[in-house]
Structure formats: structure tokens, C-alpha cells
Amino acid sequence: MTLPLTIAAEAPGLAQRLGKTLATLPLSYRAQEKGASASVMLIAGDGDWAARATTAIDAGARGVIIADPGMTGADAILTLADRAEQAGAVVELAERYAGDPTLLRHHADLIQHLAATSTILMSQVGDFATPADAALDMVRTAHALGQPLTLTHMWQASHAVVVRGTAGEKLFEGMATSGSGGVGQRIDALGFGRTLRLALRGDGSASPSDLRIANAKGERKLSPVYESVDRAAWLRAHAALDRGEPDGQPLRQFAADVAMIQAL
């Protein structure tokens, strides 16, 4: 049975973003009526977002969507994971790159092909609050691709953040550049006789990203998914609430990624 859910944005600044997504969601999602409490809250992923999400759950929210989650206290994220599981609440991360619907659709296929590569290069263009936030975006994409990434170096050059590390036996290098033109994230995974080229849009639209796999037989473009990151997160939250299966493990992995970057 599909549960009817009322949804609301944490702050007026998110209302437009929520409204655009609500228009594409199933009718079981309804906008919050004046004076009524919301079943699911959309919370901005800046500042102390984990603490605010915990407060929302304490106030009775059955689900929370975090929009573009960034750096915050790792301990606060772990507290949120524990509280969500205790309350039976669902927390979904709407991540601009790691949550890309086309990437997630082809997750298993990409992991299989990445096993034959030895180097992962990542470049990112867009605004970021801090160098650590830029590094976090890249780390999260690597983990979304099933890569056990460990960063060893991070430094800031002119208008850019550079990170280096390893993903198992693979070498990893990423660079994030601040800018408004050509926003997105590009991943090139190189190996003997095999190449992956992924171009993730990261603009919040339903326009699909471009994912391609090349080997000795030629290049293959993976089928696109015409869906926004936000809509995909809302649908995952709804499905998890229907199943009654809250899972704090994704939050614990996010906390581990944050802690790794903070330790550099």
C-alpha cells in the first residue's frame, strides 16, 4: 500500500526547488497544508545540516531529504544515523554528482568495467563553499562507483582544489575548479584496452548525463535516465518508507568520508 506523504521545505529558499520536484512526483506526495505537520522535510545540505535533520526527526518527521549535503561534523552525521534508525525514519542524500540517476542505473555495469582500469582521473567545475566541500564531491562520486577511495593529499592552487589518493590498487587524482561555465564533473578511468568516460551534469535538471565505455570493440554509450537527482531521492525515500526499512549505513559512509577529508 502506498502511503500518502506531506512534504515541506525547511526554509523559504528551498521552496522553489521543492515545488519543481513536487510537480513530477506521484500523487501520494502532497504539499504541506497551512498548520499541518510534514511527513518528509527537505533540508539544505549546508552548515549544520545533520543536526537540523536530527531535530526534524525528533519533531516527528518520518523522512528527511538532504539537498546537496556538504561538510559538517562527522559525529553529528553518526548521531543522525542512529536517531533515524531508532525512530524508523528515512534519510536520503540528494547528491548532485554521486546521486546522478544515470550513474546509479548503471552502477553494477560501471563497477564491472572499472575493475579493468588502473587510473581514475576526475575534474569538476562549479561553485564550492570550501576546498573540503569540493574534495567531498569527488570522494562521494568515487564511492558511488564502488571505489574504496583513500585520499592521501589535498591542496589548493589558484582557483582550484587538487586531491590525490588510491582506490584499491588504482591511482586517483581529482581537480575541482571554481567557475560558472561548463559546470559538471568528468571522470576518465583508464586501463589496458578499456576506458570509461563519464560526464555528470550536476545542474539539478532532468537532462541526462553522458556515460560511455570503450574497449577494443569500440565505444558504447549507456542508456540515459531523464530524471533529476531530487526526484530520484524523493522516490527512494518513499520506497523505503513503504518497506519500513530505514538504513543508516549510507550516512555512516558519508561520515567516514567527511572524517577522512578533515584528517588531511
What kind of feature is each model-predicted range?
Residues 172-235, 239, 245, 249:
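NAD(P)-dinucleotide binding in Rossmann-like oxidoreductases
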